Amino acid sequence: MEGFTLETHASRIIEVPLLGQEDQSVEIDCSSLPSDATELCEILVNEQAPREFWTKFAHEYYIRGLREQAILILKSGLETLKDSESLCILNANIAAIYLSMAREAMLKKDTDLRDEQLRNVRTYLEAANNIDSKSEINVLLHGIYRILLNPTDKESLENAARCFDFVLQKSGGNILGFLGKARILYAKGNYRSALKLYQRALVSNPQFKPDPRIGIGLCFWNLDMKTDALSAWTRVQQLDPKNTVVDTYIGLYYYDLAFQNVNNDSFVQNYGKALQHIQRAFKTRNNDPVASSILERYVYSKKNYEGCIKLAENVIQNSFSSSLIADGYYWMGRAYHQMGNNEKAMASYQKAKAADDRHLLSSVGIGQIQILQNDLTSAKLTFERIAEQNQSCFEALVVLGCLHASDSKPDLTKARMLLDRAFNLVGSSKLPRVVDSDLYITQARLWEKEDTKKSLGFLTRALDFLESAHMSVGPELLNNIAVLQYHLGLIPEAHGNIIKAKSVLPDANPELSLLLDYNLARCEEELGNTSVASEAYVSILEKHPSFIDARIRKCLLQLSNPNEETFKEIRHIMNADSQNLEVRAFFGWYLSKQKRRPVEDPEVRHCSQTLRHWHDDIYSLVQLGNAYMRQAREFRVHNDREKLKRQKLYIKAIQSYDQAIKFDPKNAHAAQGIAIILAQNRQFSKALLILSKVREAIKDATTLINIGNCLAELKQFSRAIEVFETVYSSTGESDTYGVLSCLGRVWLQRGRESKNVDYLKESVRYATLALEKNPENPSLLFNVAFVQFQLCELIRQKPENSRTVEDLNFAMQQLDASIETFTKLVSVEHPPYSPTSIEQRAKMAKNTTKRQLERAIQAQIEYEKSVAAKLEDARIQREKEKARRLAEEEALLKEKQERERQLQEERQKMQEEVLEWRKSQQKASEDDMSLSDDEEKQSGKKKKKDRKKRKSKSKQESSDSGVSEDDEIPLSDARNKTKKRRVNRRVISEEYTFDQDSDAEGNQEEEVSRTIEEKQDNDITDNQDDNKELNLFSEEDEE
């Protein structure tokens, strides 16, 4: 902290006054000061020089680098001067010099010298604090001492911050207080607050050194306002061209700007400017670690690895920042790495890691060397640690994912996760990254069985990469993309990619040609071109009769219009290749579509035979579970024995599904089967949990309908309605009546649960819509009538204050409609319930419910009439009360206006009386003054004699009291006398008014006395202020 407490504008020739000779002095030329200040100290001691001369000469030695001599002068001053103020300032100056020496020792990494200088600082700073602990200089030095003692310790920084806060509170414009506080805030990462303090310091003194603009630029840089940072540093360079520290920062700006626009034409220009400024700073200060750090990168890019190692050593030796030291070791390791010296490279990387444990690139270097040394286990641990500490490191994730994928026992799940994270980082990265197409294909292969859509995305990226790089695209990649698109339902896109694959297919690859022909036929089949697909299958079978998949697809197409030949062909395929599980699965599906015999189900028999030989065939297990569940649901229960038999069928179905899940834990069809059985047994929570997981795997409306039914049974009506509406919006017109019936049922359950009429109206609406979609369905007709009846009952049962006559009339309409529908359903051929029960329901509604509703309507009419009468009475009473209040307010207003008028007349009368009284008083005073003038003329001689007598008498009294005639009268006494004369004057306020006519004279006298007292108090206050100003002035003179 150069110039912290010393005078920075001292004269070059200092005149030391000689003791006892006021007009003579000794001139000392500061440009030719002796290297030994002992003689100068003797002169100052002999002449008893004031404190400022000791500090001036100490400063002159200090700026010439002779700090020990400066300290010698200040210590001699401590032995000579005895006043506390001088001792405090001299101790503070010595502490400031030791602080600067400690800072230099810290930069040179001389820990012992630094500690010694800091001990000296503490010694002299404590001496200064013992004299004046609240001195701004001492507090500032204590704050700087705390920073140098431990720049990274939070407690030390907090203590230093309290020191600077104290100084700023005591002296709000202290520049060093601003800079110290800003330095601490910057170290804490509070760059905005630090910026404000640096700016306040700059406003206070734009010419201050060190320049606050440097700190302003650093704050702007960390706030990502790099253009503003450049402006601040450029201004520093304009004001002080010799300041090469700023060249480093300006070079850093252009270096960063260049690498933000690597593919831009401005890269070369910005990089050249960066090197120009960095080289200028390096030439002036070749030990600058920041400049060396940037230059080592440039030298490395030129493949001058020896030069890079030398610059890295320079950074390590001259830097006190752990991050810069780690950076130096890292570039040294990279140079050795490129030179093939893996041992030295590993040692350098490890030293970089030891210097800064958060240095990411050194950890990557260690992992790379471990891979080169074939220590894959250690490499895996290293890159796992990197991925945990820095989740945005793309390279670490890629390497770690490849290591897991290429392991002897590959962890595909972890490999997928790591590579997926790496690819997600590519899009968000500001730096351009190149990803090889093989890496995309590898990731697609890892995700193929888990997420088809994601796998297709990676294959598409690989295709885009090859096309953008103008590289050839193989038919295998196009075929794989088409297969995934087919599974995702993107049939037109898959068809187009297969055509492209056939166009680039080499002639000498018949196996791939057969595969593409079959895939193209499958696409034609899905597009509805069954004739084209059938012809394609026939063509394939002509060339390759043993291609079983083509034969199966051909039979499936023929089943749309089956004949005896088709059945024979299916059985022939089964007999010819009964060991093929695909054939057996197809034959089992074929049996499930046939009419089942009551004694034995051929589907169950076929699946059981398959599982005897292939117990892990998942398709057969799921198909067997479906067969058992279908049998249980179709089984009619009339007694407990039959109920137990149906329960056994459900248990068999669950066992089949459970076996399928054991072999394939992610089999969604088996899971859905278990969920359906749980729902049949009213275990809706468990069923919902399973169906929620199955939903993403099976893209089928039936899964959503099952979820909605479970939610409705669990009374989660809002969610159930949302699910059914989603299904309704995505279902074809011919199939919507079932979903509409589900919606009507949910709204009915919700309305009955919450007793809400609007919910039942929604139920009626959806039930009616379902009936409109399928008017011939008697179940839907019954649903409408039932909901209408429930709506009528709910409205009727509501209390009188919660319903209206209109609501009851609407309920009557719904009841009539339901009665009509029930009567109609009795004569339907296949009613949903027995005609007797439906007829009984219609009679009850017609005879009982309708009469109750009619009585309710009559009671509601009477209730509403009574309520209306009460409301009318209340309204009349409110209007009367309002009229009464208005009349009272009007009377009060008139009374107030009359009172104000009377007061105004009285006020005007009193003002006229005061004016007349003033005139009479003025006339009386003029008469008195004329009379007194005559009397004074006559008695002038007499008064003069009396004054002489009083003067002689006052002299006698003053001599008795010890006061001489030459003593001055204090200014305060003189003013007090003036005040006494002013007191005798009578002043009447112009604002004075009489309260009562009868007490006018007495009030006048009280007002005059009060005015005089206030005036006297004001004069005394003014007198005190004057005395205060005089005392301050006298103190400045003394100083």
From Swiss-Prot:
Cross-referenced SUPFAM superfamilies: HCP-like, Regulator of G-protein signaling, RGS, TPR-like
Region of interest called Disordered, as start-end residue ranges on this chain: 912-1039
Alphabetical UniProt keywords: Coiled coil, Ion transport, Phosphoprotein, Potassium, Potassium transport, Repeat, TPR repeat, Transport
Location of Phosphoserine modifications: 930, 932, 959, 961, 964, 998
Disulfide bridge map: none
Coiled coil segments of this chain: 838-929
Protein name: Tetratricopeptide repeat protein 1
Gene: tpr1
